[in-house]
């Protein structure tokens, strides 16, 4: 790399709440809500397949090494996810149009799959580099830095190959890489909570939200699996139920309220009911859904200290208990 870089928490530098006009916040929240509705409608069954913990951890550590904001790491994960889904779809499409020769078809499939595997690290780094270019507060990661990093891992690439990789990602996504991330929803909702008189300071919630959002990205599957089981009150969901649940995984507004509610419980559980009540009135998301999501996050993040776990209460009943508490105090 271009000399040693000391990791820092760029997301918290010069970050302030309460300095944006209420009209601007309202417009931003409305825009995010519209984007979220569209994303939920268009949710594909393949989304989420490339959010494996090892991949997410790689992106997070690389972003930290390059001193990038947390928003960049989330953006990079979303870009990589959508790009790899497109690549996988293209491979399947090419495999189906090949002549019906079983032996040749198998060879073509293996070749296409291997090509995808061989370029994966390059694609991942390209997604991080592209994400860094979307933030005004980050320095753009130079090609030399990227090439040196890849070389340290044993991958030898030229500047031309690096530029081609970025262009491949851009073309595959129709140059639409400024994708919304859960952090944008979290921070916008925190702004609204601040104006609504939330008892827990937004900055305190923000720091905890970043930690929990990392947790959700790293433990994406187990958290959403537990949420699915709680929502259907069944420990063994069917494949069809799992496929229908895909839209929930793409609901960033729901994720944001769950993150904030869980953060509020950690910061000051006595104010939890007030925070959840505000979130319900702002987003229209049911108290039960907020309670279930916050419980799923807390049980994976805090474990035994979570309400319900201490008394060995089933998850869906514990979530109902949280919902009841919120209803009675708002």
Swiss-Prot record:
Name this protein carries in UniProt: Cyclin N-terminal domain-containing protein 1
UniProt-annotated location(s): Nucleus; Cytoplasm; Chromosome
SUPFAM superfamilies per UniProt: Cyclin-like (SSF47954)
Biological function: Plays a role in the different steps of crossover formation during meiotic recombination. Participates in the crossover differentiation step of crossover-specific recombination intermediates through its interaction with PRR19. In addition, stimulates crossover formation through the interactions with RFC3 and RFC4 and simultaneously regulates cell-cycle progression through interactions with CDC34 and subsequent ubiquitination of WEE1. May also participates in an active deselection process that destabilizes or removes excess pre-CO intermediates.
Domain Cyclin N-terminal as annotated: residue spans: 27-178
CC terms in the record's Gene Ontology section: chromosome; cytoplasm; nucleus; site of double-strand break
Subunit structure: Interacts with PRR19; this interaction promotes crossover formation. Interacts with RFC3 and RFC4; these interactions facilitate crossover formation. Interacts with CDC34; this interaction regulates the cell-cycle progression.
TM annotation in the entry: none
GO BP field: reciprocal meiotic recombination; regulation of meiotic cell cycle; spermatogenesis
Keyword Membrane: no
Keywords: Chromosome, Cytoplasm, Meiosis, Nucleus
